Amino acid sequence: MKKASVLMIIGPLFLLGLFVFPLWNIMLGAPQYPEPLGINIHIDGIRDVNEFDIQNIDGLNHYIGMKTLPKPEDMWEFSTFPLIIGIMVFLGSLIGLLGYLGKVNYQWFIGWFLVMSVLGVMGMYDFNQWLIDYGTNLDPNAIMKLANPDGTPMSYKPPLFGNAKMLNFDVSSLPSTGAWMMFTGMMMTVIAFFTGQRAHLLKSKK
């Protein structure tokens, strides 16, 4: 159980990487841009991949009626997500410490993982809703008004995950370093659960 508890203490600490590294990355490539434009989405705001990328993206979006990219104060998520991550890191490592001291059993480990998974799904849903609003809620007075073949207004929603073609841009939307660190930490808590379960079964057979 002690080995499982050590894994449970360490696993949630990987989520601290979200305070340093981006969670998600969106890149836009086109022939007129030798170096693609990109944004890194952190839990506390959106930042350029290269200097002036946000400024250039906002400039392009202005012509087709899209909103400017939000600043941290424009979205409640950018103040709430760091708080949630901090709480989950504290609770996860506390559960691991209590497990090491024999105060809780291994089932608490998977409980933390399930709560974190639900929060992750909710976060992805919220992110997708923002992408929908960002790509479809266009300014009716935009300089360029493009329509689909059926006459409906064209959507500029970036993909939630993967690649897509938008006008002459190739757009990619993929997890970044922070997301992979979070995934690694969460998988460590799953391993901690099964390690603790195995130790419990071996102990009960003696």
Tell where the protein language model's regions lie, with residue ranges.
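Long, glycine/tryptophan/cysteine-rich extracytoplasmic
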Residues: V20-F78, N128-S173
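Hydrophobic alpha-helical transmembrane segments
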Residues: I10-F14, L18, E77-L97, I110-G120, ...
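Juxtamembrane interface at the cytosolic side of transmembrane helices
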Residues: K2-V6, G92-M122, T189-K206
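Membrane-interfacial loop-to-transmembrane-helix junctions in polytopic alpha-helical membrane proteins
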Residues: K3-V6, D74-E77, L101-W108, L167-T177
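Membrane-helix exit/interface motif
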Residues: I64-K71, L91-G99
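Juxtamembrane membrane-interface segments at transmembrane alpha-helix termini
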Residues: L119-L131
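A hydrophobic membrane-anchoring alpha-helix module
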Residues: F14, S172-A199
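N-terminal signal-anchor transmembrane alpha helix
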Residues: K3-L28
